[in-house]
């Protein structure tokens, strides 16, 4: 995974409350056997009309927001079903971070584990940032992962990350990498465990041999 000490770029306003994962990635795009091509389905019913033509008024279809890499959204972003495709679609589209007052719990976990940064701020602070980025010339946002601060034209605010998620971004670790980084502690725990409970050691292999 990529190391992220800072995420910055143009932000697009998406002030929609309770935007669920079914809207972020509609069901017809879940039929693929791999992750490829999910950018096409991102927010499909918002980006395109019933005739399949782009809706020119939708923010991500506006030329001035074509380079957007950050979304500033309403509360409860990513609620609904647990489809991880919503995260993959956002990332394939080029979105690197979402700022909102709150997120769906499962979506938050999926996003952070896939290196999509989610920043939860007070609703008033998100409102200030939304006002900024509603003018394309004021839409540059900087998210400093190390200091856990976000900066727009009118606001600098702090946000919280768990130490595990912060480390994953700063060191470019996925879940497997984060686990492997704790190998010494895992081996030490295992050694203590087997010393205290020797009758459990290799119980799986002994059971297998007995049943063979």
UniProtKB/Swiss-Prot annotation:
<keyword id="KW-0028">Amino-acid biosynthesis</keyword>
<dbReference type="Pfam" id="PF00694">
    <property type="entry name" value="Aconitase_C"/>
</dbReference>
<dbReference type="InterPro" id="IPR050075">
    <property type="entry name" value="LeuD"/>
</dbReference>
<protein>
    <recommendedName>
        <fullName>3-isopropylmalate dehydratase small subunit 1</fullName>
        <ecNumber>4.2.1.33</ecNumber>
    </recommendedName>
</protein>
<dbReference type="GO" id="GO:0009316">
    <property type="term" value="C:3-isopropylmalate dehydratase complex"/>
</dbReference>
<dbReference type="InterPro" id="IPR015928">
    <property type="entry name" value="Aconitase/3IPM_dehydase_swvl"/>
</dbReference>
<comment type="subunit">
    <text>Heterodimer of LeuC and LeuD.</text>
</comment>
<keyword id="KW-0432">Leucine biosynthesis</keyword>
<comment type="pathway">
    <text>Amino-acid biosynthesis; L-leucine biosynthesis; L-leucine from 3-methyl-2-oxobutanoate: step 2/4.</text>
</comment>
<keyword id="KW-0100">Branched-chain amino acid biosynthesis</keyword>
<comment type="function">
    <text>Catalyzes the isomerization between 2-isopropylmalate and 3-isopropylmalate, via the formation of 2-isopropylmaleate.</text>
</comment>
<dbReference type="InterPro" id="IPR033940">
    <property type="entry name" value="IPMI_Swivel"/>
</dbReference>
<keyword id="KW-0456">Lyase</keyword>
<dbReference type="GO" id="GO:0003861">
    <property type="term" value="F:3-isopropylmalate dehydratase activity"/>
</dbReference>
<dbReference type="InterPro" id="IPR004431">
    <property type="entry name" value="3-IsopropMal_deHydase_ssu"/>
</dbReference>
<dbReference type="InterPro" id="IPR000573">
    <property type="entry name" value="AconitaseA/IPMdHydase_ssu_swvl"/>
</dbReference>
<comment type="similarity">
    <text>Belongs to the LeuD family. LeuD type 1 subfamily.</text>
</comment>
<dbReference type="GO" id="GO:0009098">
    <property type="term" value="P:L-leucine biosynthetic process"/>
</dbReference>
């Amino acid at each position: 995974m990529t190391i992220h000490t800072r995420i910055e770029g143009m932000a697009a306003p998406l002030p929609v409350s309770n935007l669920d994962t079914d809207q972020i990635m509609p069901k017809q795009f879940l039929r693929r056997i791999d992750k490829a091509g999910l950018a096409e389905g991102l927010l499909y019913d918002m980006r395109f009309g019933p005739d399949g033509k782009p809706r020119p008024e939708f923010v991500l279809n506006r030329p001035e927001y074509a380079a957007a890499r950050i979304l500033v959204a309403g509360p409860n972003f990513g609620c609904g079903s647990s489809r991880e495709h919503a995260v993959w679609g956002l990332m394939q589209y080029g979105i690197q971070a979402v700022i909102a007052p709150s997120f769906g719990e499962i979506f938050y976990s999926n996003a952070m584990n896939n290196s999509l940064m989610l920043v939860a701020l007070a609703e008033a602070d998100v409102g200030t940032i939304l006002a900024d980025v509603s003018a394309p010339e004021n839409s540059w946002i900087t998210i400093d992962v190390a200091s856990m601060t976000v900066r727009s034209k009118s606001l600098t605010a702090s946000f919280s990350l768990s130490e595990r998620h912060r480390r994953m971004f700063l060191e470019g670790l996925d879940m497997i990498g984060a686990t492997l980084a704790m190998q010494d502690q895992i081996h030490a725990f295992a050694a203590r465990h087997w010393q205290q409970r020797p009758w459990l050691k290799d119980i799986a292999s002994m059971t297998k041999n007995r049943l063979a």
